[in-house]
UniProtKB/Swiss-Prot annotation:
SUPFAM superfamilies: EF-G C-terminal domain-like, P-loop containing nucleoside triphosphate hydrolases, Ribosomal protein S5 domain 2-like, Translation proteins. One of its GO terms (biological process) is ribosome disassembly. The lineage of its organism: Bacteria, Pseudomonadati, Pseudomonadota, Betaproteobacteria, Burkholderiales. Residues 8-290 form the tr-type G domain. GTP binds at residues 17-24, 88-92, 142-145. This is Elongation factor G. GO terms for cellular component: cytoplasm. PANTHER family: RIBOSOME-RELEASING FACTOR 2, MITOCHONDRIAL (PTHR43261:SF1), TRANSLATION ELONGATION FACTOR G-RELATED (PTHR43261). Belongs to the TRAFAC class translation factor GTPase superfamily. Classic translation factor GTPase family. EF-G/EF-2 subfamily. Keywords: Cytoplasm, Elongation factor, GTP-binding, Nucleotide-binding, Protein biosynthesis. SMART domains: EFG_C, EFG_IV. It is found in: Cytoplasm. One of its GO terms (molecular function) is GTPase activity. It comes from Polynucleobacter necessarius subsp. necessarius (strain STIR1).
Length: 700
C-alpha cells in the first residue's frame, strides 16, 4: 500500500492551553470542519469527542492526550489536501507530564488562550515546555464573544509574561457579544462566518471603516516582520514595493518555523468563528516533518547520528503514550520519525534490548479507531500487541539499531497510602496500580518497607484523586486513601573531608573485611548524587569500587534525619584498605554504606520540603484575606497583577505541606469566587521547627 499523503503535506500539531481556555471545544470544531464529526460535540454536554474517558466528561477537563488524524483542504477548499495529526493535550497542571510527552513528538503547536483570562500560569508552563523542545507555534485567542474579551491585552501578556514575539495576522471585528468576525491582515479583507451553516460557509468583505486605520497599522507591523526573513524582501519592503500574498506567507512561515515569531489569530470556537482560519494557518505557517531538523539519535556504540524524515530510511519511532483500551487491550501511541513499518513486522526496543512483533496498527480518531496495514515517516499511530514498550522508548528496525533521545520525567511531590477495602481487592489493586504506573511515568507505586503499606506518589492532589478514581472505574478496585504525605528530601550543608567506614567480621572460617574513606560535599540544588572514584595505588581494588558505590546508593533511599531520600550530595572515595582473603563485594558495600551514613551526620544534614508556585485569581475585596492566608501558610508573596475588568492575581511560593485542602479553604475565604493553580517549583530547606515536627512524627 503506497503512501496516500506526501510527507510535505503532513502537519503534526498539538493543541495546548490553560484549563477553560476552550481547547477541547476548539479541537472539536477542528474535527467538525475537517469533516470527521458530523455533529459538533460540546464539552458542556459532556459529549466532546476528544475527551473520551468517563472522568474527563464528568469533570469537563481533558486528562489524556488523544491523537486524531484529520484532513484539510483550506477553508475555501482551494488547497492541496493536508493530513493534520492532532494531539490534544491536557491543560491542568497536574497533568504536565502529558503535555511534556506530546511536545516531544510534535512538529508544531497551537496555543489557545482565553480572550478574558489571557496568559495564565499553566500557559507559562506549557510555553516553557514548547521552548524546551523548540516547537514552532501559533497563538489562537479564543472566547472572543465572552464579556471582558480583549485580544490586544493577550498580545501584551504574551510579550511580557512569555517573552514571546507575537505577530498579528488578524485583528477582531468587535468583541464580547459584538464579535462579528476578523480582519485578515494578509488579504486586508474582513472575514465573516455564516452562523446558519455552523461556520462552514464564509464571505470576504471590505474592512469596516472604523477599523481601517487599526488594520493598516497592524498590517504594517506584520509586513515588517515578514520582510525581516531575508535581505531581498527587506530591500523590496524598504523600497516601498508591496509584498505579494505568497511572499508574505512564505516569509512568515520561515520565521515561525525558526521560532522567531508567533503568528496570532482570534475567534470563538463555541460560536463557530475563527477555527477555520486557524486550520489554514496550521497548513500555511507550521512545519511539515521535512521542515524540522532530522531527529537526533545514538547508534549502538553511542555515536551521535540523525534519522531523516523519509520512507527510504530505516524504521525508527518513539513511543510517547500507553493507554488501556477496553476493546483491544494495551495501545502504544508512537510517532514514526523515519522509514516504514507494516503490521506483523518485528521491531527492536533498544532500551529493553528486546525484539517484539507488532500486532495490529490503528489510526486513532479520538476514541474511534481504524485498522491500517502500514505506517510511514511522519505518521502518528497506535500499535496493539507490544508488551514491553513504555513511554519514551525507541522502536526501531532490528537491523539498524538507534536510540532516540530519552524523555526526562519530573519526580513526584506528593504521596498517599492506599489500602484495598477487601481481600479480593488486594490482588486486583496491585495489577491496577502497575498498569496505571506504566501509562504515566510521573505516577509511582512502592511498598513502604516498615509499615507494609502501598504508597502512591504523583504530581498533585488532583492527579492522585483521578488515578484512584480510575482504579475504581476501570479495574473495579475499591480502595481507601490515607492523608496526603509530602515528599520531603534530605541533603547536607557542609563538607565532611574524611569519614571512615570499616566492616570487619571474624567468626571462624572466612571473615569479612571492607574499609573505605570518603569525602562528602554538598552539590548545587537539583544536581543529584555524584560518586567519584579517586583511589590511587590500588588501596581499594578496582573490582570492589562498584560495590562501594552500590552501598552508598542504597543508603541514599533513607537519610539520617527522618529516613527521607538524600539528594544533591557528592561522595568521593579516596582511601581504604583490603584483606587478601576476607575482602569481598558485600564487605565493601557495607563499608560504603556505613561511611556515608556517618558522614551525613557530620555534614550538617537538613530537611528539604517541596515549594509550590501558587497563583490565585480573586475579586479585589478578598485580596487581603488571600494574602493573610498565604502568610499563615508560611507563604512568600511573589507579586500581584491586575485582571482587566476587576480582580487581582496574587502569586506566592508556599510549602506543599501547608497547601492540603487549599481549595476548600480558598472557597470559604472568598465565597467561592476565587480560583487557583499550583505547580511544583523547587525544594527548599525546611525551617527548624518544621523539620523537628517531621522528624518527631517519623520517630513515632
Amino acid at each position: 500500500m503506497a503512501r496516500k499523503t506526501p510527507i510535505d503535506k503532513y502537519r503534526n500539531i498539538g493543541i495546548s492551553a490553560h484549563i477553560d481556555a476552550g481547547k477541547t471545544t476548539t479541537t472539536e470544531r477542528v474535527l467538525f470542519y475537517t469533516g470527521v464529526n458530523h455533529k459538533i460535540g460540546e464539552v458542556h454536554d459532556g459529549a466532546a469527542t476528544m475527551d473520551w474517558m468517563e472522568q474527563e466528561q464528568e469533570r469537563g477537563i481533558t486528562i489524556t492526550s488523544a491523537a486524531t488524524t484529520t484532513f484539510w483542504k483550506g477553508m475555501a477548499g482551494n488547497m492541496p489536501e493536508h493530513r493534520i495529526n492532532i494531539i490534544d493535550t491536557p491543560g491542568h497542571v497536574d497533568f504536565t507530564i502529558e503535555v511534556e510527552r506530546s511536545m516531544r513528538v510534535l512538529d508544531g503547536a497551537c496555543m489557545v488562550y482565553c480572550a478574558v483570562g489571557g496568559v495564565q500560569p499553566q500557559s507559562e508552563t506549557v510555553w516553557r515546555q514548547a521552548n524546551k523542545y523548540q516547537v514552532p507555534r501559533l497563538a489562537f485567542v479564543n472566547k472572543m464573544d465572552r464579556t471582558g474579551a480583549n485580544f490586544f491585552k493577550v498580545y501584551e501578556q504574551m510579550r511580557t509574561r512569555l517573552k514571546a514575539n507575537p505577530i498579528l495576522i488578524q485583528i477582531p471585528i468587535g468583541a464580547e457579544e459584538n464579535f462579528k468576525g476578523v480582519v485578515d491582515l494578509v488579504k486586508m479583507k474582513a472575514v465573516y462566518w455564516d452562523e446558519a451553516s455552523q461556520g462552514t460557509k464564509f464571505t470576504y468583505e471590505d474592512i469596516p471603516v472604523e477599523l481601517q486605520a487599526s488594520a493598516e497599522e497592524w498590517c504594517e507591523k506584520m509586513l515588517e516582520a515578514a520582510a525581516e526573513s531575508s535581505e531581498e524582501l527587506m530591500e523590496k519592503y524598504l523600497g516601498g514595493e508591496g509584498l505579494t500574498e505568497e511572499e508574505i506567507k512564505k516569509a512568515l512561515r520561515q520565521r515561525t518555523i525558526a521560532n522567531e515569531i508567533v503568528p496570532m489569530l482570534c475567534g470563538t470556537a463555541f460560536k463557530n468563528k475563527g477555527v477555520q482560519a486557524m486550520l489554514d494557518a496550521v497548513v500555511e505557517l507550521l512545519p511539515s516533518p521535512l521542515d524540522v531538523p532530522p531527529v537526533p539519535c545514538e547508534l549502538e556504540d553511542g555515536t551521535p547520528a540523525v534519522r531523516k524524515a523519509s520512507d527510504d530510511e530505516k524504521f525508527s519511532a518513539l513511543a510517547f503514550k500507553i493507554m488501556t483500551d477496553p476493546f483491544v487491550g494495551q495501545l502504544i501511541f508512537f510517532r514514526v520519525y523515519s522509514g516504514v513499518m507494516k503490521s506483523g513486522d518485528t521491531i527492536y526496543n533498544p532500551i529493553k534490548g528486546k525484539k517484539e512483533r507488532v500486532g495490529r496498527l490503528l489510526q486513532m480518531h479520538a476514541n474511534e479507531r481504524e485498522e491500517i496495514k502500514e505506517v510511514f515517516a511522519g505518521d502518528i499511530a497506535a500499535a496493539v500487541g507490544l508488551k514491553d514498550a513504555t513511554t519514551g522508548e525507541t522502536l526501531c528496525d532490528p537491523d539498524s539499531i538507534v536510540v532516540l533521545e530519552r524523555m526526562v520525567f519530573p519526580e513526584p511531590v506528593i504521596s498517599q497510602a492506599v489500602e484495598p477495602k477487601t481481600k479480593a481487592d488486594q490482588e486486583k489493586m496491585g495489577f491496577a496500580l502497575n498498569r496505571l504506573a506504566q501509562e504515566d511515568p510521573s505516577f509511582r507505586v512502592k511498598t513502604d518497607e516498615e509499615s507494609g503499606q502501598t504508597i502512591i506518589s504523583g504530581m498533585g492532589e488532583l492527579h492522585l484523586e483521578i488515578l484512584v478514581d480510575r482504579m475504581k472505574r476501570e479495574f473495579g478496585v475499591e480502595a481507601t486513601v490515607g492523608k496526603p504525605q509530602v515528599a520531603y528530601r534530605e541533603t547536607i550543608r557542609k563538607t565532611c573531608d574524611e569519614v571512615e567506614g570499616k566492616f570487619v567480621k571474624q567468626s571462624g572460617g572466612r571473615g569479612q573485611y571492607g574499609h573505605v574513606v570518603l569525602k562528602l560535599e554538598p552539590q548545587a540544588p537539583g544536581k543529584g548524587f555524584e560518586f567519584v572514584d579517586a583511589i590511587k595505588g590500588g588501596v581499594v581494588p578496582r573490582e570492589y569500587i562498584p560495590a562501594v558505590e552500590k552501598g552508598i546508593i542504597e543508603t541514599l533511599n533513607s537519610g539520617v534525619l527522618a529516613g527521607y531520600p538524600v539528594v544533591d550530595v557528592k561522595a568521593t572515595l579516596f582511601f581504604g584498605s583490603y584483606h587478601d582473603v576476607d575482602s569481598n563485594e558485600n564487605a565493601f558495600k557495607m563499608a560504603g554504606s556505613m561511611a556515608f551514613k556517618d558522614g551525613m551526620r557530620k555534614a550538617a544534614p537538613v530537611l528539604l520540603e517541596p515549594m509550590m508556585a501558587v497563583e490565585v485569581e480573586t475579586p479585589e475585596d478578598f485580596m487581603g484575606n488571600v494574602m493573610g492566608d498565604f502568610s499563615s501558610r508560611r507563604g512568600i508573596l511573589q507579586g500581584m497583577d491586575d485582571i482587566p475588568g476587576g480582580g487581582k492575581i496574587v502569586r506566592a511560593e508556599v510549602p506543599l505541606a501547608e497547601m492540603f485542602g487549599y481549595s476548600t479553604g480558598l472557597r470559604s475565604l472568598t465565597q467561592g469566587r476565587a480560583t487557583y493553580t499550583m505547580e511544583f517549583k523547587h525544594y527548599a530547606e525546611a525551617p527548624k521547627n518544621v523539620a523537628e515536627a517531621v522528624m518527631a512524627a517519623k520517630a513515632k
